[in-house]
């Protein structure tokens, strides 16, 4: 129940205020979520934004709005490399503050975009096991997952994990956690980072 969670965390959200004041001084006022499709970036991101009083954006939706096409249509029309070029351009041009940004799983192929997002805030990697990922994901192409010809979910996972780890400021392991549990870990990690700022 999202409202129940919001009320539960909303009561404690002031404790994070001082940490975020410090983080803002270090250009860390945005929180960018990265990870595989199905890791919960949008689900966790929406609740995280409510708890912190932040805005929320989903960069996949920004891409669809800019292109006036669905992700799967863009991939079909432009191919995976064409899609990545568009994804890089859109993410590299995001200009927001006090915002939780849920990114597409393939954004880590876009170095320009990732450097921009890192310079504008803290990057949180929502880590998920391949087994859990396989259970959560349905139609990959329908979700706009960028797969090369003949590529499997396992090989895609192995290819992306080092990139997620490369760009992450914070890693949150979601194994054995529901949305609420993952959110708690994210908040605690952000608070600890704010305390050190």
Where are these regions (language model features)?
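P-loop (Walker A) phosphate-binding loop of NTP-binding proteins
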Residues: 36
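Hydrophobic anchor at the beta1->P-loop junction of P-loop NTPases
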Residues: 33
């Amino acid at each position: 129940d999202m409202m129940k969670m919001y009320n539960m965390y909303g009561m404690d959200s002031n404790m994070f205020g001082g940490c975020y004041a410090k983080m803002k001084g270090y250009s860390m006022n945005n929180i960018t979520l990265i990870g595989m499709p199905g890791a919960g970036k949008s689900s966790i991101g929406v609740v995280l934004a409510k708890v912190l009083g932040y805005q929320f954006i989903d960069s996949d939706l920004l891409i669809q709005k800019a292109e006036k096409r669905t992700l799967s249509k863009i991939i079909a029309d432009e191919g995976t490399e064409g899609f990545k070029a568009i994804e890089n351009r859109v993410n590299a041009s995001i200009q927001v503050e006090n915002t939780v940004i849920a990114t597409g799983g393939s954004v880590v192929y876009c170095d320009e975009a990732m450097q921009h997002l890192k310079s504008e805030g803290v990057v949180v990697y929502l880590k998920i096991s391949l087994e859990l990922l396989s259970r959560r994901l349905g139609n990959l192409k329908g979700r706009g997952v960028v797969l090369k010809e003949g590529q499997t979910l396992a090989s895609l996972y192995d290819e992306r994990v080092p990139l997620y780890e490369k760009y992450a400021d914070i890693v949150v392991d979601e194994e054995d956690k529901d949305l609420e549990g993952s959110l708690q870990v994210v908040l605690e990690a952000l608070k600890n980072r704010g305390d050190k700022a």
